[in-house]
Amino acid sequence: MASARVPQQLFLQGVAAVYLFAFASLYTQIPGLYGPEGILPARRTLRPQGKGRWQQLWETPTILWEAPRLGLDTAQGLDLLTLLGTVLALGALLLNSLRHPFIYLLLWAAYLSACQVGQVFLYFQWDSLLLETGFLAILVAPLRRPSKHKIPQGGLAGALPHEDLPFWLVRWLLFRLMFASGVVKLTSRCPAWWGLTALTYHYETQCLPTPAAWFAHHLPVWLHRLSVVATFLIEIAVPPLFFAPIRRLRLSAFYAQALLQILIIITGNYNFFNLLTLVLTTALLDDRHLSAEPELRCHKKMPTSWPKTLLTSLSLMLELTVYGLLAYGTIYYFGLEVDWQQQIVLSKTTFTFHQFSQWLKMVTLPTVWLGTASLAWELLIALWRWIQVQGWSRKFFAGIQLSVLGTATVFLFLISLVPYSYVEPGTHGRLWTGAHRLFSSVEHLQLANSYGLFRRMTGLGGRPEVVLEGSHDGHHWTEIEFMYKPGNVSRPPPFLIPHQPRLDWQMWFAALGPHTHSPWFTSLVLRLLQGKEPVIRLIQNQVANYPFREQPPTYLRAQRYKYWFSKPGDQSRWWHRQWVEEFFPSVSLGDPTLETLLQQFGLKDKSPPRARSSKNALAQTLNWVRAQLSPLEPSILLWGLLGAVVAIRVVRTLLTPRPLQSSKQTREEKRKQAPKKDSRAVSEQTAPNSNSNGSWAPRRKK
């Protein structure tokens, strides 16, 4: 079993980077989303119910309960929380010493606290995925940094007994995420996925496309269909290879997953989600694949025994068999054939929903047993490593660590089986009842979650889009354009990764149904009629670009349009659109319709917020930081943070002297392997040069 210390460090750095983006992105939107004048004020979610302090904290686990003790309201507490999270994540990304379980515990607790008051704007699957991944990072992070003088070795020699157990959970999480995301596309009975036409709609109907999506949308239809087949292959057939005993199969699975995520990043603005998925794929790598040391990257050509040669041959045969089965299954189940006359690849789904359901019933429980067997193997390896530990004190402390982390690993695996089994109801019902009880007891902590992205393809008849309009007289209407979501047909789609404009995302969901399905939209209308600047900055960060910057609109309404990508021949236009219907009626402040909706959705404040002391130094500091950062467009702020991290790491690499240990060791090995000469020649070659200040080099033979 190859060592995985380098992938573990990559994982920890990747989690820190995603936390950095998530906290910084959320920080820029707090006043407009959760402030006292925001769309959904956070203070409404934290109202004491007369319960004890610890019971209240357990039922709604958020540090923001303590904000009043600091003289802060809930929104200011959220400001402080996200700023501290950003700083801690930045530190963990740059400093090895801060990649400690305690730091990752603070990051996880801070993001969980934010999600408790985030309401609908923090109900995305990637928020749950970050919480689950972040908790695993607490277990993966080492309590003590390994000595720099010890070179990690492969096999059992260079690893601590417990260190690979939590990292195995990362691989299991990646499997659950990808397998479920592939399966739900077919269990949903979505005609676009079953007809292999989903990608002919996806690029223009996704929430926030990138400019590259326009070009991808105009690729040939047969290539779109083939891409859907490849998606099913990568998401359903490849994930079991994550647990393959053959190393090259795991590496092939890694590159397949990485390719899919990179293509999604290029064509869609999915914030930090795909970056986080790429971080999870590090669990498929090992030191030998990533190390710069030649002796770790490749095997030396040395004579091998016949049993080892036989084992290598059998592994190669098994590997080729797996590739052959994947190719045959893809061709058979999706009817792949080449039309040489048209020079295209034809594809179609050759199985029925009933057949797929039967197959899913047949394989879901075996995948659970596959995970169980893989975990059992990891536990046996950990136990064997513990047996090899020398010294009773080291063995004692290693045993404690192994017991704690082994128990935590088994516990997290057990509770994860419950949400994983949602993909197949029959398997869910056959799970051990103890697993259900354990999961129910900690479900609110989001330690294990169910996943299933892009279950159904929306916008098959055109992309629905809500367009807000304002007026001063009720006759002449002006469109209110958002920074990111489609509006102006001549404006190209933006590239925002890793920022997530949460209001723009919810506007996309709102367009899929009536406005009553999105109660927050009524609050948005109210805040715009009131002219609240924090909400205006969610729409246009530069208030000068907002059409009603001088005076709030007297009337507001919303229209629903259908948008399509423009044709390649259209000049200076990225979209064309068609009006569909009125989405939200024309209202003004005090309008009975607006008042009724606010009352119906519980969006009217029963009492004004209590004013906090203006002399609070912490609150004044938070307000000052907000004033300095608010003029920056959020995606530029995040790119600036990323650029700063890259610059610091490059400078640090250039200024750090390269260690001589590895080069000296290599020379020593070569010297030992050199053919023996007479003693005089050997002494002449190895004698140190007295003028070299302690360093030496072999003399050249004349």
Swiss-Prot record:
Localization, UniProt: Endoplasmic reticulum membrane
Gene Ontology BP annotations: protein maturation
Main location: endoplasmic reticulum
Domain of life of the native organism: Eukaryota
Composition bias, Basic and acidic residues: 665-681
Membrane topology of this protein: Multi-pass membrane protein
Positions of the UniProt region annotated as Disordered: 660-702
Protein keywords: Endoplasmic reticulum, Glycoprotein, Membrane, Transmembrane, Transmembrane helix
One annotated Gene Ontology cellular component of this protein: endoplasmic reticulum membrane
InterPro entries found in the cross-reference section: LMF
TM region positions: 10-30, 75-95, 102-122, 123-143, 164-184, 226-246, 259-279, 316-336, 363-383, 396-416, 628-648
Its job: Involved in the maturation of specific proteins in the endoplasmic reticulum. May be required for maturation and transport of active lipoprotein lipase (LPL) through the secretory pathway.
UniProt xrefs under PANTHER family: LIPASE MATURATION FACTOR, LIPASE MATURATION FACTOR 2
Similarity comment: Belongs to the lipase maturation factor family.
The name this protein goes by in its record: Lipase maturation factor 2
Source organism of this protein record: Rattus norvegicus
